[in-house]
């Protein structure tokens, strides 16, 4: 795999150069990832991307090609190139489990190390967590709106080809049942889905020929796209050719509520009571909710999912919260800029629960560990110790664990969190 080290901003390395020159580069520091606010009206966010970051961390190194580029462009000096040549991360990383809900100021990731090794991770880390968490947060709202009906990720053609793989992973973590993206299926063991598009029908001289070809190749349990020409004619034709075994039909246009109801009635009248109806066509969580009373069996979601459904970033930041002073002690530090202030000190985090196991507050502490308080659930887990990645957070296993964590975390939130009405974060963030 190619190195991930240049998936970063120019200033990370010029800052490193200046720190090496000043003698401060080896000071121990703690950086935290958090968001100051949720997107307007959102009640919670869902963390995703941690596993991807950890996978890429193993490849965050500077090989000959990268060093040659940095040297030829005079981006950094020889001393900095020498440091980068042997760069490996040797610190500690902890944070919220992937799939966990987060709120304003939740320390979703905490990086401990020297300033030099922690600062250069900023851009790479944030680019992953901001995108993946935006998709997961949207996917969580969509899957909640869908209830027991599965949502299927179909957004690859609306995203960068690599981002599409990440989006598929994040969507499945946040409750989606599968993806159309084969690379995501290969890399993360995700269930993949799909049958045919309008182009397949238009390729043939008639809809009959197209359906016959699809059924011969894929079997009667396939899903036929029935709105290329006339929906009624296509449904009747599909039933004629496949009989009661026809797996499903897909609707991709028009008034989906009315059309789904009509198609369900038609299928039932033809004896195909078990044939499923899938709807697509630029769905978001609100469109899915509007279809709750319609006889729909599953939803295919694309554009709105991979763009965060109106919130394409999670607005996460990476800030140093403590650093080693001249006496060798860790000293809290904080940014004081108006509107962008940070809170100094390395945080510990826990979620306060009531007697029913429902979350009532996000509790953060610097001098006190809130996980030691009564009726709280600890939120921080270790991912990397002394530069060594702990097992279970990457690859297929990482996705499985994150999917389970999302389901448990969402179930723990007050019922109002799963509604689409706008409001403040569903639980407050408290500092102790």
Residues covered by each model-derived region:
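Ordered alpha/beta subdomains of enzyme catalytic regions
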Residues: 1-217, 320-432
């Amino acid at each position: 795999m190619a190195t991930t080290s240049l998936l970063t901003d120019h200033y990370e390395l010029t800052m490193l150069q200046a720190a090496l020159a000043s003698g401060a580069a080896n000071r121990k520091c703690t950086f935290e990832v958090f968001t100051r606010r949720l997107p307007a009206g959102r009640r919670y966010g869902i963390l995703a991307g941690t596993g991807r970051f950890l996978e890429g961390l193993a490849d965050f190194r500077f090989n000959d090609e990268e060093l040659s580029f940095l040297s030829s462009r005079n981006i950094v000096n020889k001393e900095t190139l020498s440091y980068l040549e042997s760069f490996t991360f040797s610190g500690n990383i902890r944070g919220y489990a992937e799939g966990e809900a987060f709120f304003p100021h939740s320390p979703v990731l905490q990086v401990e190390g020297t300033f030099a090794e922690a600062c250069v991770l900023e851009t790479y880390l944030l680019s992953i967590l901001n995108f993946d968490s935006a998709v997961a947060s949207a996917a969580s709202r969509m899957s909640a709106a869908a209830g027991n009906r599965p949502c299927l990720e179909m957004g690859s053609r609306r995203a960068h080809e690599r981002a599409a793989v990440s989006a598929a992973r994040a969507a499945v973590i946040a409750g989606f049942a599968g993806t159309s993206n084969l690379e995501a299926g290969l890399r993360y063991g995700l269930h993949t889905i799909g049958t045919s598009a309008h182009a397949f029908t238009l390729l043939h001289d008639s809809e009959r020929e197209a359906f016959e070809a699809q059924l011969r190749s894929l079997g009667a349990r396939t899903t036929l796209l029935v709105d290329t020409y006339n929906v009624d004619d296509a449904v009747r034709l599909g039933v004629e050719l496949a009989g009661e075994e026809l797996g499903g039909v897909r609707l991709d246009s028009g008034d989906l509520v009315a059309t789904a109801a009509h198609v369900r009635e038609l299928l039932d009248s033809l004896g195909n009571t078990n044939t499923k109806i899938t709807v697509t066509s630029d769905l978001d969580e609100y469109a899915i909710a509007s279809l709750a009373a319609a006889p729909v069996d599953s939803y295919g979601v694309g554009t709105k999912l991979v763009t965060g459904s109106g919130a394409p970033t999670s607005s996460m930041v990476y800030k140093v919260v403590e650093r080693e002073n001249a006496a060798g002690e860790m000293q809290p530090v904080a940014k004081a800029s108006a509107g962008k202030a940070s809170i100094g000190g390395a945080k510990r985090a826990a979620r306060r629960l009531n007697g029913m196991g429902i979350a009532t507050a996000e509790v953060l502490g610097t001098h006190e560990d809130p996980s030691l308080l009564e009726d709280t659930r600890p939120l921080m887990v270790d991912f990397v110790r002394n530069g060594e990645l702990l097992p279970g957070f990457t690859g297929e296993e990482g996705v499985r664990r994150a999917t389970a964590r999302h389901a448990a975390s969402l179930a723990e939130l007050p019922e109002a969190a799963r509604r689409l009405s706008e409001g403040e974060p569903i639980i407050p963030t408290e500092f102790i």
